[in-house]
């Protein structure tokens, strides 16, 4: 009997269980997307990847620029990945640690997105391409390119994490409310169900905007950075992050659709129950003239 009761319990609440499953998948996708490039273990979840193009005619100039000092030798081979919460630098030369007094060395290191200007690599990755004389002055101005600064600008100024953070918090809140209405014999379920409809629609709208902005930011960097750097820097789009963003949106949309269908089903069931209630006999028909003429026959 217990097994039958459990089967009936889950069968009756299967739509809400699907909603919980969709919600839980969305939470995991959004969290892994948020912490991408926060440490070397999850740097594969990047938004944009930058590196110097070794086919560029300026590549030899970049090599010579880094060869001027033993501390920067080989930095032209670095790969920089930009994420929501941080920036990861990969393929760091092995000799770089000895010249910078690093106690432990790894060829990959990640920094928080707003704490880059103070790290040694930020200054060491600056390259001076040429000196251009001004038409109004005999003095020459330096043309400086910093690949790490471009990655920082992507994470700080182009693709912001705040919409994603708000979506994660609201999605976790929605999971708790769905879990609440799934448990039987709890009060205020009607109010919570109505609130869930509003909350799910808000989350879909919020992350819909966030996913579209992520798509725009990734493609803007992909198209603008190579041209603006005279094709010195190549850019690769983070397909994994883009897929996670759109799949999480799809699951949130499914979640909202399921909740609306459950609400409409419950409203229809309630209406059918009200319609099936038999009408009570009118106690005011005390005289034969008050009733139908069919009942007034002698």
UniProtKB/Swiss-Prot annotation:
Question: Which residue positions does Phosphoserine occur at?
Answer: 288, 296
Topology relative to the lipid bilayer, per the entry, is: Multi-pass membrane protein
> Where is the PTM Phosphothreonine found along the chain?
293
Q: Which residues cross the membrane?
A: 17-37, 163-183, 195-215, 243-263
Keywords recorded for this protein, A-Z? Membrane, Phosphoprotein, Transmembrane, Transmembrane helix
Among the GO biological process terms of this entry, one is: conjugation with cellular fusion
Q: Name one GO cellular component term.
A: fungal-type cell wall
Q: Where is the major localization of this protein? A: membrane
Q: What induces it?
A: By mating pheromones.
For whether the record's keyword set contains Phosphoprotein, the answer is yes
Name its cellular compartments.
Answer: Membrane
PANTHER family listed in its UniProt record: FACTOR-INDUCED GENE 1 PROTEIN
Function in brief: Required for efficient mating.
Q: What is this protein called?
A: Factor-induced gene 1 protein
Q: Which organism is it from?
A: Saccharomyces cerevisiae (strain ATCC 204508 / S288c)
Q: What is the lineage of its organism?
A: Eukaryota, Fungi, Dikarya, Ascomycota, Saccharomycotina
Q: Which gene encodes it?
A: FIG1
């Amino acid at each position: 009997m217990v097994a039958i009761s459990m089967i009936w319990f889950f069968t009756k609440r299967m739509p809400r269980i699907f909603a919980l499953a969709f919600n839980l998948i969305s939470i995991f996708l959004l969290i892994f997307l948020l912490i991408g490039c926060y440490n070397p273990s999850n740097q594969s979840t990047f938004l944009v990847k930058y590196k110097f193009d070794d086919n560029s005619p300026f590549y030899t100039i970049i090599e010579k620029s880094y060869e001027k000092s033993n501390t920067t030798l080989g930095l032209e081979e670095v790969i920089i990945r930009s994420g929501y919460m941080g920036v990861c630098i990969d393929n760091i030369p092995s000799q770089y640690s000895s010249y910078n007094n690093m106690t432990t060395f790894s060829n990959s290191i990640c920094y928080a997105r707003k704490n880059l200007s103070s790290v040694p690599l930020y200054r060491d990755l600056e390259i001076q391409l040429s000196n251009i004389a001004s038409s109004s002055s005999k003095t020459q101005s330096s043309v400086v390119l910093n690949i790490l600064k471009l990655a920082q600008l992507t994470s700080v100024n182009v693709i912001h994490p705040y919409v994603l953070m708000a979506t994660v918090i609201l999605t976790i809140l929605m999971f708790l409310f769905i879990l609440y209405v799934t448990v039987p014999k709890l009060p205020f379920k009607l109010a919570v169900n109505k609130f869930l409809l509003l909350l799910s629609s808000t989350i879909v709208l919020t992350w819909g905007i966030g996913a579209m902005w992520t798509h725009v930011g990734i493609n803007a960097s992909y198209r603008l950075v190579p041209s603006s750097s005279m094709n010195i820097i190549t850019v690769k789009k983070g397909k994994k992050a883009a897929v996670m963003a759109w799949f999480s949106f799809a699951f949130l949309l499914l979640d909202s659709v399921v909740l609306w269908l459950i609400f409409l089903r419950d409203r229809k069931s309630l209406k059918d129950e009200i319609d099936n209630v038999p009408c009570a006999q009118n106690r005011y028909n005390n005289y034969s003239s008050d009733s139908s003429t069919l009942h007034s026959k002698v």
